[in-house]
Amino acid sequence: MPTMIKISISEVTVYGELSDTLCGQAVAKVLPIDARANVWGDEFYFTIPLTMSLDETSTTSIKVGDIGFWPPGNALAIFFGPTPMSTGSDPVPASEVNLVGKIIGDATVLRKAKGTSRIRIEETMKRKESEARSERL
C-alpha cells in the first residue's frame, strides 16, 4: 500500500504518495525529512539519509509530479516542470532516478516556493481535499 505524504515548502503544501516499491518504502522509513532544498529548473532536490542502487523503476523519462530517488547523490527529487536538460515541457533528470512516488494534484504550484531553502516531507493520513472530495462523489 502506498504511503501518503505531505510536502511543505514555505507557504506551499502539496500531498503525494510514495510507491510500494523497495526504494519507495525505504524513503518512507526515513520520514519525516527536513532538508535544505536545492533547485534545478523546476525540480527540488535534497540529500536524504538513504543509500540505494538503481532498481527496476529507474528511468530518465519523468513527468511533472513525479518523485524520484537519485542514487549518485543519495537525493530525493521532486519534479514540477522542465529542468535544464528538458527539450519540452517534461522534466529530464541529470541521470536515471528510481521512481518512488508522485504528487497528487497540480505539482506546478511548487513554482511558488522557488527561492525557499527548507523542505519538509512527512507521512500523513490525509489526502489533498480535492482528491478526497472526488472520491466521495
Spans of features found by a protein language model:
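Long, hydrophobic N-terminal alpha-helical segment
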Residues: 1-34
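Glycine-rich active-site loops that engage anionic ligands at enzyme catalytic sites
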Residues: 19-23, 30-128
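Short, basic, low-complexity termini and linkers enriched in Ser/Thr/Gly/Pro
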Residues: 127-137
